[in-house]
């Protein structure tokens, strides 16, 4: 059993009697949470793929050309292959070969990087400027903050290290404005709040200048 299959079993999103059903269910995740909770975050281009006999439906192994690493230097400084379930119903990820650069996030198991539909994976050219800046330094600064999801009103922050994420309340849904343009960063005084990035909120915390 691969790590992703085990995760889906724990989530209870499918039953053993219905392996072929469309069953991949993921909760929305802010890109900052995806960054902070991933072992590996990289920008890469897929240059090949093959199906290997692992698990009930096999595992897709993508060969990648790593362009840049944002997180995971101690876990796996250079990633050559990424693994995902072959079946989309088990959250397997389908990527184009020799076409796009991707932002890829995932976990490391037994020296291999695994990813899937519940990870934050996006074409690089689809990321906003704020998201790219987040990958470079802002998201890392906010990993001690907590992004609290709000699905319906009323909802409140309950501690000073929380940012209230309300994209799901918008008519536009997820991903919304906070996902695309904001990071939750600890401010002077120890509290966390959303930061758009016109100027560093506290130069003792963020040692960077926006272009």
UniProtKB/Swiss-Prot annotation:
The record marks 85 as: Involved in metalloproteinase-binding. Zn(2+) binds at residue 24. InterPro entries: Netrin_domain (IPR001134), TIMP (IPR001820), TIMP-like_OB-fold (IPR008993), TIMP_C (IPR027465), TIMP_CS (IPR030490). Disulfide bonds join 24-91, 26-118, 36-143, 145-192, 150-155, 163-184. PROSITE patterns: NTR, TIMP. Residues 105-188 are annotated as: Mediates interaction with EFEMP1. Residues 1-23 form the signal peptide. The keyword Secreted applies. The keyword Zinc applies. It is found in: Secreted, Extracellular space, Extracellular matrix. Keywords: Disease variant, Disulfide bond, Extracellular matrix, Metal-binding, Metalloenzyme inhibitor, Metalloprotease inhibitor, Protease inhibitor, Secreted, Sensory transduction, Signal, Vision, Zinc. GO terms for cellular component: basement membrane; collagen-containing extracellular matrix; extracellular matrix; extracellular region; extracellular space; nucleus; platelet dense granule lumen. It comes from the Eukaryota. GO terms for biological process: negative regulation of extracellular matrix disassembly; negative regulation of membrane protein ectodomain proteolysis; response to cytokine; response to hormone; visual perception. Residues 24-27, 88-89 are annotated as: Involved in metalloproteinase-binding. Residues 24-143 form the NTR domain. One of its GO terms (molecular function) is metalloendopeptidase inhibitor activity. Mediates a variety of processes including matrix regulation and turnover, inflammation, and angiogenesis, through reversible inhibition of zinc protease superfamily enzymes, primarily matrix metalloproteinases (MMPs). Regulates extracellular matrix (ECM) remodeling through inhibition of matrix metalloproteinases (MMP) including MMP-1, MMP-2, MMP-3, MMP-7, MMP-9, MMP-13, MMP-14 and MMP-15. Additionally, modulates the processing of amyloid precursor protein (APP) and apolipoprotein E receptor ApoER2 by inhibiting two alpha-secretases ADAM10 and ADAM17. Interacts with EFEMP1. Interacts with KDR. PANTHER family: METALLOPROTEASE INHIBITOR, METALLOPROTEINASE INHIBITOR 3. Belongs to the protease inhibitor I35 (TIMP) family. It is linked to Sorsby fundus dystrophy: Rare autosomal dominant macular disorder with an age of onset in the fourth decade. It is characterized by loss of central vision from subretinal neovascularization and atrophy of the ocular tissues. Generally, macular disciform degeneration develops in the patients eye within 6 months to 6 years. This is Metalloproteinase inhibitor 3. It comes from Homo sapiens (Human).
